């Protein structure tokens, strides 16, 4: 959630920055609500003060033997007016809060202005795409020749479209990838491995920004009742990991907090009908190793560079060509202030495809979660800055290996970094 000060003290500039990312802030409507808030807040305070004064006068009048009935009636009337004003103010604040919940984060000044992915800016490339001397197959056809290692037909029978059953060496390779990623991030990059619930409540989804705006993208498994909140399957481990700090005040000495987790992720892919219908690229259920950092405000942009670099290391160790892209204002996620995408080369598509998205959220999520740390200089709690990124999407990494490492005889070479995780197996044979 945006800092209310941005909307109260500099709404025109805030609207301009939001427009750069395609969001139209109704300045007139918000300004009108803000004026009403000021008026009601002032009236509520005046009524409170007046009632306090009158209440004190009752005691004095009673001590002097005066008739206090008129004063009691007056205080009672003021109390009724105060209750009405408080109720009206509460309703107005709820309206303002609802409006504010739908406003995305402000883009950082270093983010290029643009409408969509066509306006993203390439920062760098690593590795050279391989030149093949045979006809390249996509990952679906490659896996079909490897004991039908990616079985979409059976998954469709079991569940429906956009699911997969993995078997044999492909399933082992998928598991090896997740283990390799976790080991790299915990042993080389200083992250703490976490195991988290795959079901979360509405407060958690609100904290990281999925609710209320993106509820249709989620799988909801349990509706809210009088006894408690509903539960939804996690769309990313970012949700449970980041929400660990919800309603907490961390010791500054513990920062930065760096966490990683391997989880399945569940997304309805609402709005993606007809896109990437073949293969693993866009599934309802997919595995991902997530990276989350909780840092001091002054450290967040350096942390973004570091976190992105940690994801890059995985691609480099796997010897997969990729490029690093800075997203434009119109292509960033709802809560992001600045985002880098890492896109891996897929020879069957003859293009780069997203395999990781790394974002600095500033205090946008922390304000929603009330995730804070105690500043040792002021001894007062301040909002944390939160960052997250994929390190990496396991399924898409599997796709990249199957396509980039395929051989003319239908086999696939195992990346050297994964051989120890495959019990020494260097080739997956057809």
From Swiss-Prot:
Q: Binding positions for ATP?
A: 267-269, 354-357
Indicate what this protein is called per its UniProt record.
Serine--tRNA ligase
Q: What is its EC number?
A: 6.1.1.11
Q: Where does this protein reside within or beyond the cell?
A: Cytoplasm
Reaction catalysis annotation: tRNA(Ser) + L-serine + ATP = L-seryl-tRNA(Ser) + AMP + diphosphate + H(+); tRNA(Sec) + L-serine + ATP = L-seryl-tRNA(Sec) + AMP + diphosphate + H(+)
This protein's species is Alteromonas mediterranea (strain DSM 17117 / CIP 110805 / LMG 28347 / Deep ecotype)
Q: How does it assemble?
A: Homodimer. The tRNA molecule binds across the dimer.
Alphabetical list of CDD domains matching this protein: SerRS_core (cd00770)
Q: Name one GO biological process term.
A: selenocysteine biosynthetic process
UniProt family annotation:
Belongs to the class-II aminoacyl-tRNA synthetase family. Type-1 seryl-tRNA synthetase subfamily.
Q: Name one GO cellular component term.
A: cytoplasm
Free-text comment on this protein's domains from its UniProt entry: Consists of two distinct domains, a catalytic core and a N-terminal extension that is involved in tRNA binding.
Pathway connected to this protein: Aminoacyl-tRNA biosynthesis; selenocysteinyl-tRNA(Sec) biosynthesis; L-seryl-tRNA(Sec) from L-serine and tRNA(Sec): step 1/1
One Pfam family, short name: tRNA-synt_2b
HAMAP family, per database record: Ser_tRNA_synth_type1
Q: Alphabetically list the UniProt keywords.
A: Aminoacyl-tRNA synthetase, ATP-binding, Cytoplasm, Ligase, Nucleotide-binding, Protein biosynthesis
Q: Which residues bind L-serine?
A: 236-238, 290, 390
